[in-house]
Amino acid sequence: MTKLALFGAGGKMGVRLTRNLVNSDFDVLYVEVSEAGRQRAKEAHGVDCVTPDEAIVEAEVVVLAVPDTAIGAVAKDIVPKLKPGTMVVCLDAAAPFANHLPERADITYFVTHPCHPPIFNDEATPEGRADHFGGIAAQQGVVNALMQGPEEHYDLGEKVAKCIYAPVARSYRVTVEQMAYLEPGLSETVCASLLVVMREAMDEVIKTGVSYDCARDFLLGHMNILGAVIFDEVKGGKFSDACNKAIEFGKPMLMRDDWKKVFDFEEIKASIIRIT
């Protein structure tokens, strides 16, 4: 049984991951340095936390469930103490992409991140439909990157990913650089920004006297069908001539001509530096 150490077990993400790890095939050591975090882990899942040094001695896999801004400092402290061949799992590409992980050739760096449950799904239970983040009851995809280490370590890293993010429907292998284009590039810089604009647009309509419920119902319903057509969920789906004309005139008013520069490598790099 693989010995896995979860660092940050009492934090927001650590508590999420523990939900799946407590019933897994891994022999888990829960690591939390703060007393409040230790108490939170105990109350949430009944687990007792150990010190970092206790975990490092035995760990074959180390999962860093700590904020992006803290990964560099945490990794700098623990990586030199790990046994050769140990796998270090990061839950986001930001810190690895920004070179915040210590150089050490005899350990493995594996990066994994959830896609989160998709808008279009076939969840059959109330729990699944309510699990917007994933890791509880809704199926989701995961993306993984073997940043460094022997090729045979990929399967172990993917096993960890499928456990902590379960239930997992699909698993995708990418590079760390490609993962950075997915997040923050695609998911945050583009998607989150445009969703904020959509919410602001809804608020503008509400100012005209349309009720909140009406505007929200109208917008989310149209997001459903428009999204189904745009993202190939409806085979052969097409917009009306009026809708296409609205897009033709609306998009230039909303988007700069050079907006795709957000995917330039230097822009992605700058975005990651800002958040780490």
Outline where the language-model segments fall.
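Small-residue helix-packing motif on alpha-helices
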Residues: 38, 55, 71, 211-217
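Rossmann-fold NAD(P) dinucleotide-binding segment
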Residues: 52, 56-100
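NAD(P)+-binding Rossmann beta1-loop-alpha1 motif at the extreme N-terminus of oxidoreductases
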Residues: 1-45
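Rossmann-fold dinucleotide-binding core
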Residues: 91-183
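Conserved SAM-binding strand-loop segment of SAM-dependent methyltransferases
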Residues: 46-52
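Active-site-proximal catalytic alpha-helix in oxidoreductases
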Residues: 138-140, 151-207, 213, 217-229
